[in-house]
């Protein structure tokens, strides 16, 4: 198993799909990395040489991925909450942030129904 950005990349998958195992790299970015490095998209990770894996490591290293990206997202949400802006308040209350209706839906964000106590 190749190890890129602290993640074990699955050997039995094609390069494009295997790179998506890294948090912060989707299919589009994965295809761009393969095009930039000159590695074919349909080659399996197990068939790559050690030099090609090193080239992939360098290409992935240019992006903010994994722990750094998670930390960046958490800090930006925390910043919104500290500012006290509308989006921050919605995050703090655990409600939808992007203008969705909450009268009937939003069960995922609000959690299970709480019965009214009499």
UniProtKB/Swiss-Prot annotation:
GO terms for biological process: translation. The keyword Ribonucleoprotein applies. The keyword Transit peptide does not apply. Residues 94-118 are annotated as: Disordered. SUPFAM superfamilies: S13-like H2TH domain. GO terms for molecular function: rRNA binding; structural constituent of ribosome; tRNA binding. Keywords: Ribonucleoprotein, Ribosomal protein, RNA-binding, rRNA-binding, tRNA-binding. InterPro entries: Rbsml_uS13_C, Ribosomal_uS13, Ribosomal_uS13-like_H2TH, Ribosomal_uS13_bac-type, Ribosomal_uS13_CS. Pfam families: Ribosomal_S13. One of its GO terms (cellular component) is small ribosomal subunit. Belongs to the universal ribosomal protein uS13 family. Located at the top of the head of the 30S subunit, it contacts several helices of the 16S rRNA. In the 70S ribosome it contacts the 23S rRNA (bridge B1a) and protein L5 of the 50S subunit (bridge B1b), connecting the 2 subunits; these bridges are implicated in subunit movement. Contacts the tRNAs in the A and P-sites. Part of the 30S ribosomal subunit. Forms a loose heterodimer with protein S19. Forms two bridges to the 50S subunit in the 70S ribosome. This is Small ribosomal subunit protein uS13. It comes from Klebsiella pneumoniae subsp. pneumoniae (strain ATCC 700721 / MGH 78578). The gene is rpsM.
């Amino acid at each position: 198993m190749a190890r890129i950005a602290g993640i074990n990349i699955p050997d039995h998958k094609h390069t494009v799909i295997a790179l998506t195992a890294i948090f912060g790299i989707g299919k589009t970015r994965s295809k761009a990395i393969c095009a930039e490095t000159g590695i074919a998209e349909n080659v399996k990770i197990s068939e790559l040489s050690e030099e090609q894996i090193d080239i992939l490591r360098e290409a992935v290293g240019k992006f903010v991925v994994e722990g750094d990206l998670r930390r960046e997202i958490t800090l930006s949400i925390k910043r919104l909450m500290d500012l006290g802006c509308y989006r921050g308040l919605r995050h703090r209350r655990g409600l939808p942030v992007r203008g969705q209706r909450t009268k009937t839906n939003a069960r995922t964000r609000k959690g299970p129904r709480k019965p009214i106590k009499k």
